[in-house]
Curated annotation (Swiss-Prot):
Family: Belongs to the ABC transporter superfamily. Ribose importer (TC 3.A.1.2.1) family.
Gene (name only): rbsA2
EC numbers, comma separated: 7.5.2.7
Location of this chain's protein in the cell: Cell inner membrane
CDD domains on file: ABC_Carb_Monos_I, ABC_Carb_Monos_II
Assigned keywords, A-Z: ATP-binding, Cell inner membrane, Cell membrane, Membrane, Nucleotide-binding, Repeat, Sugar transport, Translocase, Transport
Taxonomic lineage: Bacteria, Thermotogati, Thermotogota, Thermotogae, Thermotogales
Reaction catalysed by this enzyme: D-ribose(out) + ATP + H2O = D-ribose(in) + ADP + phosphate + H(+)
Designated name of the protein: Ribose import ATP-binding protein RbsA 2
InterPro entries: AAA+_ATPase, ABC_carbohydrate_import_ATPase, ABC_transporter-like_ATP-bd, ABC_transporter-like_CS, P-loop_NTPase
Main EC class the enzyme belongs to: translocase
Amino acid sequence: MMLNTEKEREVLLEARNITKTFPGVIAVNNVTLQIYKGEVCALVGENGAGKSTLMKILAGVYPDYEGQIFLEGKEVRFRNPREAQENGIALIPQELDLVPNLSSAENIFLSREPVNEFGVIEYQKMFEQASKLFSKLGVNIDPKTKVEDLSTSQQQMVAIAKALSLDAKIIIMDEPTSAIGKRETEQLFNIIRSLKNEGKSVIYISHRLEEIFEIADRVVVMRDGRKVGEGPIEEFDHDKLVRLMVGRSIDQFFIKERATITDEIFRVEGIKLWSLDRKKLLVDDVSFYVRKGEVLGIYGLVGAGRTELLEAIFGAHPGRTEGKVFIGGKEIKIHSPRDAVKNGIGLVPEDRKTAGLILQMSVLHNITLPSVVMKLIVRKFGLIDSQLEKEIVRSFIEKLNIKTPSPYQIVENLSGGNQQKVVLAKWLAIKPKVLLLDEPTRGIDVNAKSEIYKLISEMAVSGMGVVMVSSELPEILAMSDRILVMSEGRKTAEFLREEVTEEDLLKAAIPRSVKVETTQREE
């Protein structure tokens, strides 16, 4: 994707010598950045490299910083995001800033609602405008539905629609595909190309390097708060980008030891999960088994029901779940997550920040929470053995290489990769028989991913049964021994790893309605 010289000369935004410090940390260190009109500029780097902080400065989230910002040649300093938006800069943050109890349309037009001559909000007009935005994005979302009732991927599309509604000159996308599937990603890329053709610019942050090579014109690499590389995308390959991002070459990215697979340890039969109104099956009669030392991968597109399947097994939806669960050949009854934990089942959820961690608690207390529930560190009279608690946490901080100043650090202050290690540590501490992993590497950098893969491999070698949901085909193929495919809540296929290709998995994952449409077009 070569930029023409005209666009190359037209600088839309320039940030000069930007430095941003937090107590004890230089998050952005003397970074200069140019954004050209009508380009897609990728910004890459590990978690903690300073990417999101730099973008929040450009978008007015952080008004206090050193350096200068020029927009179309004029110096600007935004005091808040609204000022940035009024000047044509929109940010889609990694952590979505949506209001759960408002509808998707109300979120899109929050504080910008269409009103009549009397100042009364014209809801019908707002719903129609939201529908047009969703149609442009190629997604089927009811503009009247509350955000809290939408899936994570649908919420992501609402955030993207909100940014498009601002008609910005520069749209900053921070990990926009971390929670959406392949089809939605392709649609988003089409939108990005349209924006580019309109002369608008996109700053695109992603850990998925294959996306960078597909959509970007230019790439900027950050490490430890500094800019360490920059240039047209044609000047980079995967290895060069990784080397710049982590400061060294990664010879082996997917670390999968060959574990000894023995007896069946876990089986589910006829799992069903009904919607809240009990009119629709979100999971429809799914059965599978896992053996000791085995990693069972579950692949599917967004809306396939994979997350719902794991949650149903874990007892997260009592009253709406049917089916049987067996551990070691013995049927167990799970009516709540507590029942699952007591029977040796752990769940690493897709959204670690809201479902996997208590962000305002320390690393120590997050790691030992299930151990307290299981009374593994509780002495007589219900008192916690604080010495044992500290020893357990220190051992996991060391074993999992969790980068934290101390066990008492608030977990919200850790990087995404280290937060995910804390979630894994809290389950490993109770020595589960089965661990359910839902998108275990979502939103974390390449180095942290490699460490998570190593941990998953070690779990399998130890004899644990591992069930791993992933939307990343290279990941599912590299880490799984067997792969189950889901579509529209149903199990559609099952493969041995050595007998399947990416094409096989995608074919099995496409919903039947889409397959029919595709066949008709071909005819």
